[in-house]
Amino acid sequence: MNQASQHKPRVFVDADVLFAGAASPSEHGASLTILRLAEITLIEAVTSHQVITEAERNLEEKLPMALPAFRLLVSRCLRVVADPRPEDLGAWAGMADPQDLPILVAAAHEGCPWLVTFNVRHFQPGHPDVTVLRPGDLVLRVRELLAGLE
């Protein structure tokens, strides 16, 4: 990993955020804004193969016309990492819904202090090293940080 990426905020992106970003009717939605922040290298957006598969499956079922935008966003904005192995999940049992546990573990293993999702309740009680928040809340935090540069 290059030195510049070590100083960028690292954010793990869940499938619902990818879906919302790809399907966004506006350029100003929080999900798409987060992906654009990654595209212009202000943050490092990370996700896992499980997340990509889930988002793509949901888009195929509900909004197939958004698939080209989704694939472009994935290629330009995200670093996609391997899913945790099943044997790596045991120590994390009970920290998130069983279906979402691999996502929480992947976020922690990748050193992402933030996991962005609309399904915050699925990641409760969570892990102390990963703050789970909605896309709009992350955008507000970024805005506050930028305002502090004055």
Q: Which residue ranges define each predicted feature?
A:
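Short, flexible helix/strand-to-coil boundary loops that buttress conserved ligand/catalytic motifs
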Residues: 22-23, 59, 127
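A residue-level structural signature of the nucleotidyltransferase/glycosyltransferase Rossmann-like core
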Residues: 10, 44, 115, 130-131
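Alpha-helix capping/helix-boundary segments
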Residues: 17-18, 51, 103, 121-122
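PIN-domain endoribonuclease scaffold, especially VapC-family toxins
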Residues: 36-91
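Acidic, PIN/NYN-like endoribonuclease modules and their adjacent C-terminal/linker elements
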Residues: 101, 113-114, 120-150
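Active-site neighborhoods of divalent-metal-dependent phosphate/nucleic-acid chemistry enzymes
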Residues: 78-115, 120-121, 149
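A secondary-structure boundary/capping signal
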Residues: 13-15, 48, 119, 134
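Short, well-structured N-terminal submotif of metal-dependent ribonuclease cores
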Residues: 1-45
